[in-house]
From Swiss-Prot:
Name of the gene: nuoK2
Reactions accelerated catalytically: a quinone + NADH + 5 H(+)(in) = a quinol + NAD(+) + 4 H(+)(out)
Name the UniProt record assigns to this protein: NADH-quinone oxidoreductase subunit K 2
Pfam families linked to this entry: Oxidored_q2
Gene Ontology biological process: ATP synthesis coupled electron transport
Native source species: Rhizobium etli (strain CIAT 652)
Length: 100
């Protein structure tokens, strides 16, 4: 059986990679994918802790996170399509002004 600390290390590594992608990259699509990596690393830890402590709440919470993430991706991709149509860019730096 795989020890719990392997899953914790995997989750931490994926979280650090995702956080670095969110903080360092300038492409909105890459930032969105890095955010998904962050959330999936948290899901790995929820499921691992739920399995090792014989509690199903970690799995249920991971399913809720996946559902909320799907809604977030749908909204973000809609905004991304509108942004590309209006500004013809995917760079975060080019989208700094908001008009009301």
């Amino acid at each position: 059986m795989v020890p719990l600390w392997w899953f914790i290390v995997l989750g931490v590594v994926l979280f650090v990679i995702g956080a670095a992608g969110v903080l360092l990259r300038r492409n909105i699509l890459v930032v969105l994918m890095s955010l998904e990596l962050l959330l999936n690393s948290v899901n790995i830890n929820f499921i691992a802790f739920g399995h090792y402590y014989d509690d199903f709440r970690g799995q249920i919470f991971a399913i809720f996170v996946i559902a909320i993430t799907a809604a977030e991706v749908a909204v973000a991709l809609g905004i991304l399509v509108a942004l590309v149509r209006n500004k013809s860019t995917l760079k975060v730096d080019d989208v700094t002004m908001l008009k009301g």
